[in-house]
Structures are given as structure tokens and as C-alpha cells.
């Protein structure tokens, strides 16, 4: 198993720059290029420009795929990662806006059909129903979608994200659903809408304490702390609605050790069971666009 994950390192670098529009991002990239003229930088700027052309044509899905391909390049320099991560964020936003326009005039039934078509690739469209009034959504449609929550083949992150959406749709409030956790190999009966986030008090306290402890350990390392939070999010998803059977201080310390090594690209000790748990949990969710669910 790989234990120097470039994807996570790239994510850390991408957190450092934020742009609100394509023009300012393009100008910043050009300025960087004028001060750092290399054959490799010129090549990736040309790739960047080709993606911008797709954006202007409103071919956002193709632009998204091209951008993700570039970010998967292992020899990407840190500044380039920042530019392409920022570009991907802008494209993702426009892609959502484009989908919303297409969905605006659809009935609830049609939207659910789209959610379940090309399964499981369009499950994220369920989030469009969150903004709708309760009267727009037919509660009986829930029965058509509950199989998603017990699909043994579905990635845990996708199942969890789908559950979170169902839990926030007013029309489904007080309906009971069965949720399967593949890591725990357990089924849980949960009442939708009963709690904003259905966990036991013990589990809520566990993650609250874990976040607090990790924050203290990374007090002077805000960027690394963001990565540590990603790990906590991954653990929350993988063990939902429960939590890891570990002592909080021990887990926080292991998260700190792991992130500290990854940031400087050192090999981590996979013989340590807690470190292996962290790595396995992250790799279980590798199709996640880190920080955002596609």
C-alpha cells in the first residue's frame, strides 16, 4: 500500500490559494509564469488555458474531468497544484449552477428518476430537494430510494452523504430507514429528521473531544490541521453512527504523527494498528474530492 499519498499533499497546497473568478486566477497564473519560466510550467499553463476554453463554452463537466486529470499528475509542483485546485473549485461551482438550472422546472418524481438513473453516479442530485418546500416532495418516493442505504457495494462516503440529504428533507421527517455500515458490518434503524445529526451522546462527545485535542496539537500549523480535520471527517463517515473504539488522546496523537510525516513526505509505520486504521480509512474514500462530495 502507498503511504506517501500525493493526493493528500496536493490538497494541503491547494488550501493556500483562493480565487473568486476565472480572470483573477488566470492573471495570477500568468504572473507566476512570467517569474518562473520553465518548459514544464509552460506546458501546464497551456493545459490550464485549454480548460479555460472549455469553461467559456460552458462545457463544465469536460473541464472538470480535464482538471482532475491534471491534478492526478504526481510531479505537479506546489504552485501549480494551487492554481489547478482553485480552477477545479470554480468549475465545480459552475457545474452545480448549470445542473440547478436544468432541474428548476422538473417535478419531484423526475428529479428522483434522475437521482437513480446511471446508479450510483448521480446520487448527489438528491441535494437539490433540500431547498424545496415539504409540499413539493412526495413522501412515498422515499421507499424507492432507501435501498441506497443498504447497498453493500456502495462506497461508504456516498451512502453517508445520501443519508445526510434524506435526513434534511422535511417531507421524510419521522420516517424510519435502515442504514448499513460496511466497516462495522452492522445495520442501524434511524428515524429521519429526529436529530440534525443522529449519533449517541457518547459518540458526539468522542468526536468533539477529538477535534479539540487535534486543534491543540496543531495550534501553530493551520494548514496541517485542515488535513487532520479531513481525517476526522473520514473516521466519522466510516464509523457512522458510532465511533472508533480507541482512546481519544491516543487517536489524536496518532493523527498528529501521521499528518506530520505526510507533510514532509516521510514513510509512515503501517505496522502500527492505529496508523493503519487512519490510512485504510482515507484510502476507502479516495474517490472523494477532498473537502467536497461530488
UniProtKB/Swiss-Prot annotation:
Tree of life domain: Bacteria
InterPro entries, A to Z: DUF3196 (IPR024503), Uncharacterised_MG237_central (IPR023402), Uncharacterised_MG237_N (IPR023403)
Pfam families assigned: DUF3196 (PF11428)
Protein name (record): Uncharacterized protein MG237
Organism this protein belongs to: Mycoplasma genitalium (strain ATCC 33530 / DSM 19775 / NCTC 10195 / G37)
Amino acid at each position: 500500500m502507498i503511504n506517501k499519498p500525493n493526493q493528500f499533499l496536493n490538497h494541503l497546497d491547494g488550501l493556500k490559494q483562493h480565487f473568486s473568478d476565472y480572470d483573477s486566477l488566470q492573471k495570477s497564473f500568468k504572473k507566476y509564469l512570467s517569474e518562473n519560466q520553465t518548459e514544464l510550467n509552460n506546458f501546464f499553463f497551456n493545459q490550464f488555458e485549454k480548460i479555460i476554453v472549455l469553461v467559456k463554452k460552458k462545457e463544465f463537466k469536460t473541464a472538470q474531468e480535464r482538471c482532475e486529470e491534471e491534478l492526478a499528475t504526481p510531479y505537479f509542483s506546489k504552485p501549480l497544484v494551487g492554481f489547478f485546485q482553485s480552477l477545479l473549485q470554480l468549475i465545480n461551482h459552475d457545474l452545480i449552477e448549470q445542473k440547478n438550472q436544468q432541474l428548476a422546472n422538473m417535478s419531484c418524481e423526475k428529479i428522483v428518476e434522475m437521482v437513480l438513473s446511471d446508479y450510483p453516479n448521480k446520487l448527489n442530485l438528491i441535494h437539490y430537494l433540500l431547498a424545496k418546500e415539504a409540499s413539493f416532495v412526495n413522501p412515498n418516493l422515499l421507499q424507492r430510494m432507501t435501498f441506497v442505504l443498504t447497498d453493500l457495494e456502495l462506497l461508504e462516503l456516498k451512502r453517508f452523504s445520501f443519508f445526510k440529504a434524506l435526513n434534511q428533507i422535511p417531507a421524510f421527517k419521522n420516517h424510519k430507514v435502515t442504514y448499513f455500515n460496511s466497516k462495522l458490518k452492522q445495520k442501524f434503524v434511524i428515524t429521519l429528521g429526529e436529530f440534525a445529526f443522529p449519533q449517541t451522546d457518547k459518540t458526539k462527545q468522542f468526536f468533539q473531544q477529538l477535534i479539540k485535542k487535534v486543534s491543540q496539537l496543531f495550534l501553530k500549523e493551520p494548514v496541517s490541521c485542515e488535513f487532520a480535520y479531513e481525517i476526522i471527517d473520514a473516521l466519522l463517515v466510516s464509523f457512522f453512527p458510532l465511533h472508533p473504539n480507541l482512546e481519544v488522546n491516543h487517536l489524536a496523537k496518532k493523527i498528529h504523527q501521521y499528518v506530520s510525516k505526510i507533510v514532509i513526505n516521510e514513510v509512515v509505520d503501517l505496522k502500527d494498528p492505529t496508523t493503519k486504521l487512519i490510512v485504510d480509512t482515507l484510502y476507502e474514500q479516495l474517490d472523494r474530492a477532498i473537502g467536497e462530495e461530488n
